[in-house]
Amino acid sequence: MTGFFTILSFSLAALSVTNAAQILSVPKGAEVVPNGYIVVMKDDTSQQDFSSHRVWISSIHHNMTRRGLDGAGVKQTYDFDHLRGYSGIFDEDTIKDISNDPKVAFVEPDAIISQHVVVQQRKAPWGLSRLSNRRGGRNYVFDSSAGSGVWAYVVDSGVDVRHAEFQGRAVWGSNLVDNKNSDGTGHGTHVAGTIAGKTYGIAKKAKVVAVKVLNSEGKGPTSGIIAGINWSIRHARKHGMLQKSVLNMSLGGTYSAGLNHATAQAIKAGMFVSVSAGNDNINSNGNSPASERSVCTIAASTENDGKASFSNWGPAVDLYAPGHNILSARPGGGSQTMSGTSMAAPHAAGVAAYLIAKEGIPGNRACLRLKQLSQPTIRNPGPDTTTRLLYNGSGR
C-alpha cells in the first residue's frame, strides 16, 4: 500500500462559515484530486431540490471557466435511495458558495484510493481448503450449488473477462476511471478469480461483473469509487438481483464520510459488501470504506491461522480470511500469487455468494451469517479485534 494511505489520524475540521455545511479536511500528506470535491446533500433533500441545485451549479460553470479553472464543473452525479450528491472540479469561491446552500450536508476533498495488495510470489494455494475445514485440511469442501444464480460485482482495476477461469460467466460492467476496458494491474482479475474462478474460486458458478474504478497504477479518486457503487446498485436493481448480489472492494484510503455513506447504501439496497481492512498494520477505523460499520470488513490471516503481519486490525474488522500467498487468475491467462487484505476480502465475498445460493439468504444478511459460521481460531489478532476466521459451514 502506497505511502499516502499510511496516515491514521484525520480531522473533520469545519472550514466554512457558521451554519454552512462542513468542508471536511483530509489527513496531512494524503493524495487528492487537484480542486476535486465531493458534495453530499442532506438526507431530506427532494429530487426537485436536488435538480434545482444542479441547475444552479451548471449556471456557475461558465464563471469558473472565466476564472481560468479549466475542466471545471460537475463530473459525476450520485442518486442513491438515501444519498444524493455529486463530484467535480471547483475553485475555492465556488466551494464556499456550495457549502452555504442549506440543502448541502457536507463537502469533502476527492482523495485518491488504492488497492490493498502488498506482494507477489510463487507458492501453492491454501485458502480454499482452509475456509471449508474447521481445523484445516487439504481439500476444498463445498455444496454443488456453488454460487449459482448470484452476481459478484468486482469494484476494482477491471477483470480479464475472457480468462478461462470464468468459463464465460464474467462480463464487463462499467469503466469509471479511464478508457481502457482491461485490467492494467492484475489485481481485479485475481480478486474475481478468488470469488468465482473454476479452479481458484469459492462460488464457482457465480457471475462476475467488472466495475473498473482503479487505473493501471492501482489508484482512483474517491468520487469514482462512489460512482462505481452507485452503478452497481442501479445495475443489480434493473435486473432484479439486489438481494442475490455481492459487491467486493479490495481497496481503501483515508477516511471519507462520503464513501462510507455510499457504501452503506449498497447494504440498505439489499447487497452483501466485503471490503479489505488495509495493509498498514494499524487500526482500520481511520480508513474508508473499511471503517463503515455496516459492511463486512475483512482482515488477512496466514496459513497457520495467525494475523498477517501487514494486516490492519481493530473493532471495525468483522472477520479474518486467508490473505497471504493466495493463488488466483492473472490477466491474459494463467495464474499468480498475491498477498494482502485485498486477497482476504474476496474470500468473504465468495463465501457470501455461496451461502446466498445454498441457503437462500438475502445479500445484506450474509455478513451476519458469515460471523455465525466463523471459527475463533486466529492467534494474536491485534488490539480489540475479533479472532473469528471465515468458514463456509460445509466441512468438518
From Swiss-Prot:
Residues annotated as domain Peptidase S8: 125-396
Q: Where is the composition biased (Polar residues)?
A: 377-389
What positions does the domain Inhibitor I9 occupy? Answer: 37-113
| Prodomain residues | 21-116
Q: Which PROSITE patterns match?
A: SUBTILASE, SUBTILASE_ASP, SUBTILASE_HIS, SUBTILASE_SER
Signal sequence extent = 1-20
What are the EC numbers? 3.4.21.-
Could you tell me the keywords of this UniProt record?
A: Glycoprotein, Hydrolase, Protease, Secreted, Serine protease, Signal, Virulence, Zymogen
Which positions are glycosylated? 63, 230, 248, 392
Q: Which Pfam families match?
A: Inhibitor_I9 (PF05922), Peptidase_S8 (PF00082)
Q: Name one GO cellular component term.
A: extracellular region
Query: In Gene Ontology terms, what is a biological process of this protein?
Result: proteolysis
User: Where does the UniProt annotation locate this protein?
Assistant: Secreted
Region Disordered: what ranges? 377-396
Instruction: List the active site.
Output: 156, 187, 342
Q: Which GO terms describe its molecular function?
A: serine-type endopeptidase activity
Supply the InterPro entries for this chain: PCSK9_ProteinaseK-like, Peptidase_S8/S53_dom, Peptidase_S8/S53_dom_sf, Peptidase_S8_Asp-AS, Peptidase_S8_His-AS, Peptidase_S8_Ser-AS, Peptidase_S8_subtilisin-like, Peptidase_S8_subtilisin-rel
Q: What is its main location?
A: secreted
Tell me the protein family, please. Answer: Belongs to the peptidase S8 family.
Main function: Secreted subtilisin-like serine protease with keratinolytic activity that contributes to pathogenicity.
Protein's UniProt name: Subtilisin-like protease 5
Q: Which organism is it from?
A: Arthroderma benhamiae (Trichophyton mentagrophytes)
Give the organism's phylogenetic lineage. Answer: Eukaryota, Fungi, Dikarya, Ascomycota, Pezizomycotina
